[in-house]
Amino acid sequence: TGNVSAGTSSFSMIVLEKELSKPYEMIDMVTTPDGSLVAMVHCNNCTSDLNAWVNLFGECTESFGVKVDKNELYGVLYRKALEGAADCGGVTAYNYFSGEPITGLDAGRPMVVRTPDADFTLANFMRSHLYSAVATLKIGMDILLKEEHVAVDSLMGHGGFFKTPVVGQRVMAAGMNAPITVMDTASEGGAWGMAILAAFMKEKETGETLSSYLNDKIFAGQTGTTLQPEPEDVKGFEAFLEEYKRLLPAEKAAVAAK
């Protein structure tokens, strides 16, 4: 089990049943507050490029004299992405606002790359940017899933990526090839989690563990939804990622050109 956070940056934390076979530069070993061994994959970039494009589309509508509520704009554009091809139809996006150690970049250049015959639609464009927000995290996670054969039963998703119902959850499920559970508090950030830890330290009863405190007092009665990965989405994400990795030299060349 574990959790995945997706906002300005992203990370996954997978609770391990045993130690990994060897150290990996892309994976940090940490522990939960109660001492369980955790493998952590951290990425510097996630939703910043998505946010920039949503703002641009908002500016476009305002140019026609139409001001759209920001939450509605996000919802419309995110849901549009689900109409796109599972592999994004030949449209590849790189969301690098900053460097990304997992892919060997010391700086970032947001990019969109497509072939002349790509199916360049709004749906594929938005889907490629949602995939891009998860792609680097998936590269790191694939070490755990495919090389270390770590079994992930489910992941708890939180962060702004999940604010629009279903969409981010479905994309993350495809990328991680695992069920993603999102609770009503999913869009809350790290400050909320730190406040919960502080409350536990102040209120815990003798012998009470963090796990029982969370299950019995914080999340008891909370509603949430779980989405299973859709096979077509998983296959499409894998195809997108292969093209993403194949075209990474273009991103690196853009960084090198300053």
What is the predicted function of each stretch?
Residues 1-156, 161-258:
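Active-site core segments that coordinate phosphate-bearing ligands/cofactors
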